[in-house]
Amino acid sequence: MLKKPKRKPGRRTYGKSLKIFIPGTLFVHARKGFGFVSPDNPEEYPFDIFVPARDLRGALDGDHVIVSVLPYPRDGQKLKGTISEVLARGKTTLVGTITSLVSPTSALAYTSMSGSQSLIPVELLPGRTYKIGDRILLSTPPWVDKPQEGASPALQMLEFIGHITNAKADFQAIQAEYNLAEEFPPEVIEEASLFSQKHITQVLHSRKDLRDLLCFTIDSSTARDFDDAISLTYDHNNNYILGVHIADVSHYVTPHSHLDKEAAKRCNSTYFPGKVIPMLPSALSDNLCSLKPNVDRLAVSVFMTFTKSGHLSDYQIFRSVIRSKYRMTYDEVDNIIEKKHSHPLSKILNEMATLSKKFSDIREERGCIRFVLPSVTMSLDNLQEPVALIENHQTFSHKLIEEFMLKANEVVAYHISHQGVSLPFRSHEPPNDENLLAFQELAKNMGFDITFTPTQEPDYQYLLQTTSAGHPLEQVLHSQFVRSMKTASYSTENKGHYGLKLDYYTHFTSPIRRYIDLIVHRLLFNPLSIDQTHLEIIVRACSTKERVSAKAENSFENLKKTRFINKFLQEQPKTTYHAYIITANHEGLSFVVTEFCHEGFIAAAELPKEYSLKKNALPESIPDKMKPGASIKVTIDSVNLLTQKIVWSIATTTEDKPKKIKKTPSKKKGTKKRAS
């Protein structure tokens, strides 16, 4: 239950300083300790507020807080704030790792959610012998405005999770850390079981029968929930008619049902290597809603007519029943398009490839940037230990599906908006000038020139294209540009989509795994089913839960990656690794280790003397070997699994070259996160 804030949101004057008090949700960086507050009212405060670790004041990741901000930072500093009050804890439990034992019933533990490297006193449950490295579930402490001098109160242990050396317990720890429920309540399972294949037959008369239409799915080889199928036909003028057929989840998950309430609570599915926490029970997600081949399935079909040049001329949206003819994988489609294999779909797939290329060219013409970001798939053994990092590559089949889904999302957003109905847009606002200037400076220091468009705007599209297709700094530069941009989110206000350069955009194509898409389906056919106030609540909840799931997925990957790097330290302690510098300043050196797709940092005090920099060193005074993009060699000094801290150092002598640590880079194992 929310408590009444002691400090009301708004402006307050303290001496000569005007402070703004803004309510929002706190997100704490699990490894670096700082946080960001996402304001409750993004229309009034359309930015996240940076909070240094020292200014969290006992606030934890996920807390609903009030942050105080000085609106006019001094000396060009970034806008940052201090937590003034915690209105409500975001979690009732924390996960801690014992780092030292004080007595048989008390210990000190590390928890990443506090945003601090300091250790927390813990009162242990009796009846067990504990060891350093034990992971335990703890009760969240109440927030105290002005904590008393002296030691922090001990947190109560609730449950034993497992020792840090037990990789099988990683999932349970992350699940508890982010409060992700895997099991569904009995009433939800029971409600899902009421539907069967017979139910589809009973509603055929009320739908467009498309069971004879040649349509099929394209997904990863491991996918089980097939949201979308595609088709391609032609009209009498030989214009393209692209069909995108999406599982009609809204037919089964009706407003205020048990299924609906649980889906609204989860907001989305969360994906881990070899495992998923679904938004819907498997009876729906893997069965009745999944567009499996050669079975009747209920769908929402979007038929879009495109001219020979690839421009939209007409569209239709209606409920249908389809029967997918093939379940294709990305690899199969790539082989067919590259003419390595013959297949009954060869002709239509090549025609789809032609249309997809037209869409891609149009996107490029309007200034849309296609990013190449570092991404790996983690391969785990039966003990859940990482055995390989497999580099992902987006192939043509991925781009084909991406282009088709983007078109469907755009058309649906345009359609609902022009019906005069409020909807959840997928918004992506332009970066602020400060971040863009910082990126321009970074690119310049890496040796790149920023050209300008005819309207005298910096041509980031051209810059990033010149670093694509295997450029050694491709992933570094693209990653830094993405970081300069704002995070995409949901909003009932249409702010456009900067990354896609679209005026209308929403999420419609993945209702099995995203609650927003389910809401959009409802608005298509029953626009009065959701009032504005309720829609605003849904939009905020889905934006927040999306970030929570992303953090959980990243935390799991980082933990496994730490295990993987530790394995190489134990087996190859003298190995040097190739890295590229990201930033260099008086605080230290940050870099990306390409072999592990991992960002590291070496504090200034630990750097060789020739790598030291003065506090206000000008970019032109930085030696070439320390400039962003410069190549360096690093070694692993130590790995602390308890805190997931990896200590690196500059390689000063010729060391062993790294042995092969990856399998042959694979084609991207399809991800469910298709649309931006």
Curated annotation (Swiss-Prot):
GO CC term, one of those recorded: cytosol
One GO BP annotation of this record: mRNA catabolic process
SS bond list: none
RNB domain boundaries: 207-527
Annotated Basic residues bias: 659-676
Disordered: region residues: 656-676
Subcellular location: Cytoplasm
Alphabetical UniProt keywords: Cytoplasm, Exonuclease, Hydrolase, Nuclease, RNA-binding
EC numbers on record: 3.1.13.1
Any one GO molecular function term: RNA binding
Main localization, broad class: cytoplasm
Keyword Iron-sulfur: no
Chain ranges of the S1 motif domain: 566-651
Functional description taken from the UniProt entry: 3'-5' exoribonuclease that releases 5'-nucleoside monophosphates and is involved in maturation of structured RNAs.
PANTHER family: DIS3-LIKE EXONUCLEASE 2, RIBONUCLEASE
Family statement: Belongs to the RNR ribonuclease family. RNase R subfamily.
Designated name of the protein: Ribonuclease R
Source species: Chlamydia pneumoniae (Chlamydophila pneumoniae)
